[in-house]
Amino acid sequence: GNSPYTDELLKAAHAPREKTAIPVRVGDPSPIKHVIYVIKENRTYDQVLGDISEGNGDPDLCLFGEDVTPNQHALAREFVLLDNFYVDAEVSADGHNWSMGAYATDYVEKTWPTNYSRRGRTYDYEGSKKISRPTRGYIWDYCARAGITYRSYGEFVGIKDVKPGGGGDADQNLDRAPGPEYFTSEENLQGHFSPIFPPYNLAISDLTRVDRWLDEFHEFEKNGRLPQFQIVRLGNNHTQGTRPGVPTPRAYVAENDLALGRLVEAVTNSKYWPETAIFVLEDDAQNGPDHVDAHRSIAFVISPYTKRRFVDSTMYSTSGMLRTMELILGLPPMSQYDAAATPMYNSFTNKAELTPYKHRPARIDLAEKNPANAPGALRSMQMNFEKEDAAPDVEFNEIIWKSVRGADSQMPAPVRSAFVKVIDDDDHEKEIPRKKRK
């Protein structure tokens, strides 16, 4: 048939052309012992990295370039620039399922359009209903069965008593006793999520989240108990559009960028750095502007074993990133999709370079707030930002576009492309040429 999946892929991935730190067979050893998986929200490649000349970007579509995201630009340049990475999902409802399970169930895929079109369904896609779960669960369930230590920072975690959408006000409540209560409905996350790390809530700064993550990370450095696998959710690059009085889209994205930079700096200066890999992606791309495809997105791999100052244009996906992490941890694939996906071999080498990363300070004012007369302010006030992606994606994207480019600017329509991959007689994948910027 036409499917790239075979049962043999459950035990071993397609072999790379050269040996790297990523094992081929499930269970084979890797010099990487700790994986940190950072999940962000909703940006396309061109929106953030379209201004990097080394990659296949379109600067005309770049909204959050190097002045807004200096850390993501530095990480792409100092480590690996991935300019052909695609998210598997359409929106956050299926995006967090794909990002944690390499699959979204039939229930999720058939019901999220009803929820997103505001026709009466609740958002029950991140652990609140068992029917939305894959049969064998998410990546933490696989870790639990394999005896891999793991911890979630905000992913599939809820918050009980901080009102979302307040534009930073909730930060002031976090340190008040007894403080907000976090919870999870996931059985295998009970006792495995941080009780001090705030989950998704746009009223809480990503810098606060990283402060809380750093508190635990430094404690792990002292006691030697760093989990083998961590999931860290930094989602404020979602933004609240131009809702008056809250951070502008540029400020939200810049805050998120600084938080990521500080996390990477801490890891690369720690005793765990020689055997750690950090993987970063967006859960979905929110149907945003990109000259190749609306699913093309930013992603980063950061490790002593990643190549340095290297452009990797291999076609990768959410499932391929998961497959790479699974191979490092000795986990089997979770679905036919990560089983058949291309692992990120080409981004890695088998020789370590331990040069640490130094975070870049923000270049714009992180306290910049939307004025009452910002383009789309009224519609932004009417949109629901309590859950990620609850706002209509095209309209929300247009508001973000106009907030950066001006009220009279026109956002281009989303691009859809077809992709074909063939496998030659030596079992190596070849990609049909993709769209290049003119």
Regions picked out by a protein language model, each given a short descriptive name:
Residues 2-438:
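N-terminal pro-sequences and low-complexity stem/linker regions of secreted or lumenal proteins
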